[in-house]
């Protein structure tokens, strides 16, 4: 790919929920579980990817969010998300002049903090592929 094209043509996003219950992931009858593996995100050709993480329980949750590049499986962004009971966290992966950017207006607790302007490659930006 040319340097000016966005990476993230094919990538995997995994959101792993850390809980004190069982260390095994499963899907129950209500279609909820302990892990989400989302197979692709894209910000190419005017497309955006929107992801919503919902805590359907009455418990507090610690969630690990990892974005992995499709071309060589390198991690391009990760952060911890701390959710209160029945909390909802939404973010978008959208085009940026230098690649792709994760943006959210949500005020949920993330570490590192995601600024309202979004976060990108060199200090948490989703990088381009050379």
Name these PLM-found stretches.
Residues 2-10, 19-130:
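Gly/Pro-rich, tryptophan- and cysteine-flecked surface segments typical
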Residues 15-16:
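Surface-exposed, well-ordered secondary-structure segments
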């Amino acid at each position: 790919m040319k340097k000016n094209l966005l990476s993230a043509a094919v990538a995997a996003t995994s959101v792993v929920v850390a809980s004190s219950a069982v260390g095994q992931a499963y899907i129950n009858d209500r279609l909820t579980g302990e892990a989400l593996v989302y197979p692709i995100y894209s910000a190419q050709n005017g497309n955006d990817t929107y992801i919503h993480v919902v805590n359907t329980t009455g418990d507090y949750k610690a969630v690990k969010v990892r974005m992995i590049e499709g071309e060589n499986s390198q991690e391009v962004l990760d952060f911890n998300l701390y959710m209160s009971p029945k909390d909802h966290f939404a973010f978008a992966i959208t085009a940026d002049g230098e690649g792709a950017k994760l943006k959210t207006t949500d005020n949920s607790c993330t570490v590192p903090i995601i600024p309202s302007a979004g976060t990108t490659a060199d200090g948490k930006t989703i990088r381009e592929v050379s």
